[in-house]
Design a protein with these regions (language model features):
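Class I SAM-dependent methyltransferase SAM/SAH-binding core
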Residues: 55-98
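A short SAM/SAH-binding and catalytic strip from SAM-dependent methyltransferases
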Residues: 106-124
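A short glycine-rich, Lys/Arg-flanked "PGG" loop and its adjoining helix->strand segment in the class I
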Residues: 124-138
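A short acidic, Gly/Pro-enriched loop at the edge of an enzyme's catalytic core
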Residues: 97-107
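Conserved class I S-adenosyl-L-methionine
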Residues: 1-50
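C-terminal lobe and adjacent flexible extensions of AdoMet/dcAdoMet transferase-like proteins
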Residues: 194, 198-236
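SAM-dependent methyltransferase
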Residues: 139, 143-198
Length: 236
């Protein structure tokens, strides 16, 4: 039986590219470039790459990029998008809980909950962070966004479980073929101290957590309870 996040991204690549959160790609890649020191020799891994919006923008700026995603329909769209722009990007169908690149990359990105923190258990989410860590070389860096657990504590979420920090909701959607779906979504929210502990226990030496603004990622943005997402930069 498919999980809700598999159903969410199945046959929905066209709709995905029209979502509001995809409008911030340019500004977000500007931040990645700054974090990469504008070094075009770096190898970058895009985990949960979807239709390739970040990977393609990075490749267009001269970076070597690999994208992985669980959804073949999303990857098919990503490959078409890259081909239309004559860009050489490797896209692979891989589960973020089970991949191994063993120190091949200088930078890994994981944006807009493309993988973490959508999994059924905390252990699965942890495995994603472990795999991201293992994919990086000794001076590697991981940049990702995740759901801010402070937000539902200060806002009214009738569906939020304060014991598990999971928000369980029903979501109605229409796929690219016009088929309607009703999904039972289950997303894990994290507070900053959890993220810091998880990443430190894996082996990251420095963890920076900031507020997250669509298309305007910045280390100068302080995280507050008004931020729906947090931006995390973890360095080996």
């Amino acid at each position: 039986m498919k999980q809700w996040y598999e159903e969410l991204f199945e046959n929905s690549a066209d709709n995905y590219e029209n979502e509001e959160f995809t409008k911030g790609t340019i500004g977000e890649v500007d931040f990645f470039e700054k974090e990469a020191g504008y070094d075009k020799s770096l190898k970058i891994l895009d985990i949960g790459c979807g239709t390739g919006r970040h990977a393609i923008e990075l490749a267009s700026r001269g970076y070597r990029v690999t994208g992985i995603d669980l959804s073949e329909s999303q990857l098919e769209k990503a490959r078409k998008n890259a081909t239309s722009r004559n860009l050489d990007i490797s896209f692979f169908r891989k589960d973020a809980r089970d991949f191994n690149f063993n120190g091949e990359f200088d930078l890994a990105i994981m944006i807009c909950e493309g993988a973490f923190p959508l999994m059924e258990t905390d252990e699965m989410n942890f495995h994603i962070l472990q795999n991201a860590f293992n994919s990086l070389n000794d001076r590697g860096k991981l940049i990702f966004t995740t759901l801010n657990g402070l937000f539902p504590l200060f806002h009214s979420f009738a569906t939020f479980d304060h014991l598990t920090f999971r928000n369980i909701t029903t979501y109605e959607m229409t796929d690219d073929s016009g088929n309607k779906k009703v999904l039972n979504c289950n997303e894990r929210y994290y507070v900053p101290s959890e993220i810091t502990w998880l990443l430190s226990s894996i082996g990251f030496k420095k963890v920076t957590i900031c507020g997250c603004q669509l298309g305007a990622f910045s280390r100068d943005e302080a995280l507050t309870s008004e931020n729906f997402e947090m931006l995390v930069v973890a360095e080996k």
